[in-house]
From Swiss-Prot:
Entry binding sites for Zn(2+): H88, E127
Protein's name according to its UniProt entry: N-alpha-acetyltransferase
Gene Ontology CC annotations of this record: NatA complex
Organism of this sequence: Sulfurisphaera tokodaii (strain DSM 16993 / JCM 10545 / NBRC 100140 / 7)
SUPFAM superfamilies tied to this protein: Acyl-CoA N-acyltransferases (Nat)
Residues where acetyl-CoA binds: I92, A93, V94, R100, L101, G102, I103, G104, T105, N132, Y139, K140, K141
Top-rank taxon, per record: Archaea
Main location: cytoplasm
Length: 167
């Protein structure tokens, strides 16, 4: 899957991630987020969930990514305890100078589409810092709802919202 879009004079392209992208994905992860993962973690997720793992390119340079996983678990959306197949956005990041161009939205939409169409997931969820208003607003725009607060979720003690959306 691949598509290009332009906003504010910048054209970007969304495509499936490749193993050759992992070094740049790790660089983006380190620059953009306090939650960092080892090399093998990215490689394993890419190998296992390749169809829903996307990167964004500007002028041939990877500037953002979304790393998912697919799992079985209790629904975050249904009232009764129901076992469902769901997508989990493990990590999503865009380099600071490329934010507010729609790249995060495009990455999420591409991954969510693959979660549903390729992996037959019924819903998607993620964790987000309660202080990360831009991300929370983006997720709400895409249909996510705050399900619950995860107290002291992050290593620095900050709480997270668990947010979920139907696919």
């Amino acid at each position: 899957m691949e598509f290009a879009e332009a906003k504010k004079g910048k054209e970007y392209r969304i495509r499936n991630a490749r193993l050759t992208d992992v070094d740049q994905i790790i660089k983006i992860n380190r620059l953009a987020l306090p939650e960092n993962y080892p090399y093998y973690f990215f490689v394993e997720h890419l190998k296992e969930y390749e169809a829903a793992f996307f990167v964004a390119e500007v002028d041939g340079e990877v500037v953002g990514y979304i790393m998912p996983r697919i799992e079985w678990g209790f629904s975050n959306l249904k009232q009764l305890p129901t076992l469902v197949k769901k997508g989990h956005v493990v990590s999503i990041a865009v380099l600071e100078q490329y934010r507010r161009l729609g790249i995060g939205t495009a990455l999420l939409q591409a991954s969510m589409k693959a979660m549903k169409e390729v992996y037959n997931a019924e819903e998607v969820y993620l964790e987000v810092r309660v202080s990360n208003s831009p991300a929370i607003n983006l997720y709400k725009k895409l249909g996510f709802k705050e399900v619950k607060v995860l107290r002291h979720y992050y290593a620095d003690g900050e709480d997270a919202y668990l947010m979920a959306a139907p696919l």
